[in-house]
Amino acid sequence: MDQEVMDFFDFSKELKRVAAAPQGYISSDPRLMATKFKSSEVPNRELIGTDYVSKIVAKEKCLLNGTLLNEQPQGKRIRTLDDLDTDDEGEETEIRRDDEYYKKFRFNLNRDKNLSIYAKREEILAAINAHPVVIIKGETGCGKTTQVPQYILDEAYKSGKYCNIVVTQPRRIAAISIANRVCQEREWQQNTVCSFQVGLHRPNSLEDTRLLYCTTGVLLNNLINNKTLTHYTHIVLDEVHERDQNMDFLLIVVRRLLATNSRHVKIILMSATIDAKELSDYFTTTNSIPPVITTNHRRKHSIEKFYRDQLGSIIWNEEDVGHQQVPEINKHGYRAAVKIIVIIDNMERKAAIQSRQSYDEALRYGAVLIFLPGIYEIDTMAENLTCMLENDPNIKVSIVRCFSLMTPENQRDVFNPPPPGFRKIILTTNIAESSITVPDVSYVIDFCLAKVKVTDTASSFSSLRLTWASKANCRQRAGRVGRLRSGRVYRMVNKHFYQREMPEFGIPEMLRLPLQNSVLKAKVLNMGSPVEILALALSPPNLSDIHNTILLLKEVGALYLTVDGIYDPLDGDLTYWGTIMSRLPLDTRQSRLIILGYIFNMLEEAIIIAAGLSTPGLFAHEGGRSQLGDSFWMHYIFSDGSGSDLVAIWRVYLTYLNIVENGHDQESAIRWAKRFHVSLRSLKEIHLLVQELRVRCTHLGLIPFPVNPNQMMDDREKAIMLKVIIAGAFYPNYFTRSKESCADTDRNIYQTISGHDPCRTVYFTNFKPAYMGELYTRRIKELFQEVRIPPENMDVTFQEGSQKVFVTFKQDDWIEGSSKYVPVSGRVQSEVYKAVMMRQNRVERPIHIMNPSAFMSYVQQRGIGDVIEGRWIPPTKPLNVELLALPSVFDKTISGSITCIVNCGKFFFQPQSFEECIRNMSEIFNAPQQLRNYVTNASAIAKGMMVLAKRDSYFQRATVIRPENQSNRQPMFYVRFIDYGNCTLLPMQLMRLMPRELTEQYGDLPPRVFECRLAMVQPSSVVSGNNRWSTAANDMLKTVAQCGLIDIEVYSLFNNVAAVLIHMRDGIINDKLVELMLCRRSDEDYMSRKDHDFRLRRQESARNLSTAQRQQINEEYLRSCQLPQDHDLPPPPLEKCKTVVMLKGPNSPLECTMRSITRVGLSKRVNIDHLSVNALLLDADPQDHHDHLIVAHEIAESRNGQTLTARGTTLMPNVQGFGALMVMLFSPTMQLKCNKEGTSYVSVLGGLGCDPDTNEPYFAEHDVLINLDVNILEDDVILINQIRYYIDSVFFNFKEENNPAVSVNERVSIYTQLRSLINRLLCKDRRYIERNMSNADFEWETNPELPLPNEPFGKRAIFPMHSLTELQEEDTGRLVQLRENCSMLHKWRNFEGTLPHMTCKLCNQLLESVPQLRLHLLTILHRDREKQIDYCNQ
């Protein structure tokens, strides 16, 4: 343990040291949290409803009626009436004049009398003068939004009184467009008398503004900060019916302030579909009952409404009649909608005969709008309509989809007229209720359904629930017709059900969505506890939801665990993090991302990602169920192999910003967006939000640190740090990529694909051996054209006696069209991902083959292969294995030279034994008579041709890979030097055609080199990303290669690639790279370990074999190493292929699943959102047996609660123990649990902690548990405590102060320390340990003897210090047992019989066969465990 770590707590900083406090063990309210439960199950906490509301509301009513004005506030933390400024409500308010202002601007008092609201003008003004609150109910189009504020302003102008009106709108675009419309109508210059404010976008000065249109959130934040309404004379709350959380909380604030210090401000509530009685009761006092003024909007055209029971001509399913309680659309519902369209068409054909309007004109203005709840239902309806077209060719329809994730180009199709003779049918979600108006719609088919987002506050899981739409929604939908002519609405429910059963209004957001932002607003408002404030809502939430929200806010660091030092389950003091979160228009976890981004000096990246996560529809959806289009793969392109949807958002935005800043015109931007399948509209919204967040962060003091250029993070470090802050921001949305819990998982993978490389191979099934598959390889390759994989980039092979077809993709960067177009993380090639996606979209694919009975005559007539004893033998190329340059099975060490280095994972070695052969060939090739065949015409060079090409100063054998794709200069070709391994680009002048005699002599001679890779190591995710070897590691290998003759130790040979250890003077380069942290130790693949074991046993027996025996064994060995050949034969003509075989696949043995590590998600199935870059989840590092961590931005839950869907996912770096380290780093508190002997840590339990008296968790649902598979030591915990301390110190503020205590210079120093500590934590080489389930549970433990950690910030710590249980020394007797067990295993290693079942006690692994035992002894886990007990095999 180094001195720097031990000196951590001596960190000198002028901060107040507070006495240490117990963390996670503070008394709780037993009524809410004390329940008995099993460790693996989530406790069922009692649901506490709204009984708490009545007492609080009664007290508030007294306040509204003026009977509590003299009461003192309870407790210093609750601000109430006497803390607020007053407008002297007991005295007559002096009338403020504004004559000079009215002289500055022109006031035209002529209003539009054609609007229906005008008839109520005098009544509205009289009501406003007489009452503090007025409710106006007017249908859309009556003019209330633009006219009522003008009526008020005109009256003020007439009397010369001061007037300042604010009007809220739920959406930004509405506030801007309405303000501009009023300015245009009144001929006012914009941003003078009338203006707008959305977010932080506002005029430089509002001094001349008397009519302000703003979003609901803008007014709410102003009122919370000012705690008075008196800045305005009139507050108009428009679209009150929408009932989002901002509106409901605004009503709370307005009502409270109206009753206390702002009694002379007038409140006007307006909506089209308002529950007037509910609002009137909410604002009623003993002195005033708000009047309700209703105005009706007359339509020019009539609308007829029909219900299901009125559609007698449609045959409904008898079982459905009268049973509509379950909201759903079954197959009969879809068919009924199709029948209605047929009826509409027949009706218009008859009408055309009887009237002047032609049928074509009826089609043009007779569009049908079908309201469906989601994209799945849209696709299903489209399929039913397509079937209708096939059955009735007389009806021609143009199907148009409309939903929020579509591209703007596709959405424009909604407004375009259909082709002549076609009827437009628009399949839409509720987006067309109000956001989109299509004039030519004459018919609406409404299934009266909606998908509503609901969040479980205990689990934080959201779900889209299919529910009956409210009548208000249905009325909005009906209003889409009757614009140009009379219309019809078909509601697919019975009239009685519609009138009696369907809800009048939708569920308010406060009852179905997270309450974090509302609770934070209540804390900032500081007029009572969150419970006391939210109880006053129009629709108060359940007390359990408030309690869960408090716990969530404590989890994200927005609230301290305590209030004035005392634990309160329903409250907590506001942290500075919470203050920041309350001022950002984001979800709390997105705000946490920005906070951590600032701390780690990645603020800009965090802002962009947070803005992108807040804006839906960035990646355009093409519609339909197929994902094979380029739009899906754009996620991979922009994620750049990071495995992160969030990184993809960041890179898309940077690309867009580059287009904007470089001055490209709009058309260029549109072309770019269309090419890469991103939504330009969403990008513009993200851009606006990014700008707003930057301004807000600046106001909060969140400004990027001034860092010296030499201290800037490079791309590699930035990628790691970005993933660390993503893990911190979205804790505990953690998942692990799980593998089969089977000791023979590796063997099963290779057995499934017959020994092929799983990282490059997929397979089909259902192709019988009798089909003679070798003749159809080209036809099978053609299947991959749909994902644009060229045929030359794959080999198709078969296994004798099997129904499988194996497709192996070539691993060559020089092949045109190779996998680099779509970057992916890990070792798996992108072609494998594309192939698996093919199967996910369509399981079966047809292949046309000949009838087996006619096959033999076909191949015999054409001389294709041989037919021996009725069996067809495909033509094969003879292979002389004795000529191969591959290492012999008896060769352990080989001397030679490295001829070419691509990277540490691919280089070529030339044995010294070939030195004379190479020299002789070089002399022959470079003889003048052999170099006369100059290449004068590029057409003479063909792909795959063997030529003589110049390497350094001499010509050598080379194979042409392909021509360069450059037409503007002399022809050049990519060639590979056969006997050296390197590839290069050469002009024709440096190439010679090989004479025939040389081709005959050397054409079939295998390369005099073999490919190698470093054994038992892999690239470090911390040092280099995307499974790439770092430059430093490659440079070290090049330095060794330049030394000349070197010795390599062959570990294994698989797929003709040797895994080797390279010996140097001072050790082995493999170990040196690990020591220098340029790579990390890694297990070898199953096939590699199997080959290594085989080689070891053959080498041990070599002394007993003769030379001839050795040669025979080696030839058999090398022959067994060769995989089946791709015959690439031309298939029979299609006219001869009458039989269709349905291939099933492609499949990959690397497909895996995810599991949640939170307690609430442990038993649920987990999917990844189908649009995510991780939607195709493959085991990208199959040799690595660690569980890889995946972090989700959001988690959705299925309707039945059994399946979770992770959205916005990020695959974390493949670092040993990364998941456990992130839990220890970012959980509010954690416990390291020991094995039953107390000698090692075996699991990490993280969460909010527990009640010290009962050990019951505060927030059981969000407790996380990770079983350790690497060694976590005391040094690691001290490092993590350092990091937590530095994170806390950035925003630490004393209780009496509002701003953080540290200066900018101190923040730079903290950032520098954090970088260093994070790198040390992640780069550490940790030893593997066995998985131990003896103490892997969710039970919190208290240990009175455990010393409390030194707590620098006391109870004001967001990340308190972790305490640590001291480990015990391993018992001597136990060590002896483990060593004896190891010795026994090694003795059984060479046994040739049947192994009795035994267990490796070191690794807790059951061993059932000798081969399994041998391979287990070669794993890193076992070798590390042997070192830990000091075992040495003699």
From Swiss-Prot:
Keyword Hydrolase (UniProt): yes
Enzyme class per UniProt: hydrolase
Subcellular location: Cytoplasm; Cytoplasm, Perinuclear region; Cytoplasm, Cytoplasmic ribonucleoprotein granule
Homology family: Belongs to the DEAD box helicase family. DEAH subfamily.
Primary site of residence: cytoplasm
Any one Gene Ontology cellular component term annotated for this protein: cytoplasm
Reactions performed catalytically: ATP + H2O = ADP + phosphate + H(+)
GO MF annotation: an example: helicase activity
Highest taxon listed in the record's lineage: Eukaryota
PROSITE patterns membership: HELICASE_ATP_BIND_1, HELICASE_CTER, TUDOR
Sequence motif: DEAH box, positions: 238-241
Record key words, sorted: ATP-binding, Cytoplasm, Developmental protein, Differentiation, Helicase, Hydrolase, Meiosis, Nucleotide-binding, Oogenesis, RNA-mediated gene silencing, Spermatogenesis
Name by which UniProt lists this protein: Probable ATP-dependent RNA helicase spindle-E
UniProt keyword annotation of ATP-binding present: yes
Gene3D superfamilies attached to this UniProt entry: 1.20.120.1080, 2.30.30.140, 2.40.50.90, P-loop containing nucleotide triphosphate hydrolases
EC number(s) from the headed UniProt entry: 3.6.4.13
Function: Probable ATP-binding RNA helicase which plays a central role during spermatogenesis and oogenesis by repressing transposable elements and preventing their mobilization, which is essential for the germline integrity. Acts via the piRNA metabolic process, which mediates the repression of transposable elements during meiosis by forming complexes composed of piRNAs and Piwi and govern the methylation and subsequent repression of transposons. Involved in the repression of LTR retrotransposon copia.
Domain Helicase ATP-binding, residue spans: 125-292
The Tudor domain, residue ranges: 938-1001
Classification via Pfam families: DEAD, Helicase_C, TUDOR
Phenotypic consequence of gene deletion: Egg chambers for females lacking spn-E display startmispositioned oocytes. At a low frequency, females generate early egg chambers in which the oocyte is positioned incorrectly within the cyst. At a high frequency, late-stage egg chambers exhibit a ventralized chorion. Flies show transposable elements derepression, an aberrant piRNA profile and a reduction of H3 'Lys-9' methylation and delocalization of HP1 and HP2.
UniProt-annotated binding residues for ATP: G138, E139, T140, G141, C142, G143, K144, T145
Taxon lineage: Eukaryota, Metazoa, Ecdysozoa, Arthropoda, Hexapoda
GO biological process, one term: mitotic chromosome condensation
Residue stretches making up the Helicase C-terminal domain: 354-526
